[in-house]
């Protein structure tokens, strides 16, 4: 298995990482989450909420797409939203860890999708 890429220390919506393995290319991109708000959860300090209101941090989602040798298999293959971005200094590590788990899981999904496509192609010949 190839080394898993990581987001930079302070990722922003629009940033992405790409992982290539065995002809597959999986991309995890950060997208802005305009639905989730800190008031929906317990545990945020008043200061954290004020920083969120002042755009000091935001919620994001990670969206994964999968290709095989340039052919798009799944877009999106997976989506996960409601993730904190910029609240802590280690946002890049936090999002990279989540993206890595998603990429590994979706790699298996992409292989299954490719197998289905090959079966369909072989039965129609």
Language-model segment annotations:
Residues 1-125:
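Acidic interaction surfaces
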């Amino acid at each position: 298995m190839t080394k898993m890429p990581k987001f930079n220390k302070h990722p922003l919506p629009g940033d992405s990482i790409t992982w290539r393995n065995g002809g597959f290319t999986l991309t995890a991109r950060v997208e802005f989450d305009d639905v989730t708000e800190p008031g929906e959860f317990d545990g945020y300090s008043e200061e954290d909420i004020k920083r969120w209101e002042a755009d000091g941090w935001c919620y994001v989602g990670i969206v994964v797409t999968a290709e095989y040798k340039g052919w798009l298999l799944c877009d999106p293959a997976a989506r996960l939203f409601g993730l904190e971005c910029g609240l802590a200094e280690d946002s890049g590590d936090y999002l990279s860890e989540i993206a890595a788990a998603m990429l590994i899981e979706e790699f298996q999904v992409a292989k299954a999708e490719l197998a289905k496509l090959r079966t369909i192609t072989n039965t129609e010949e």
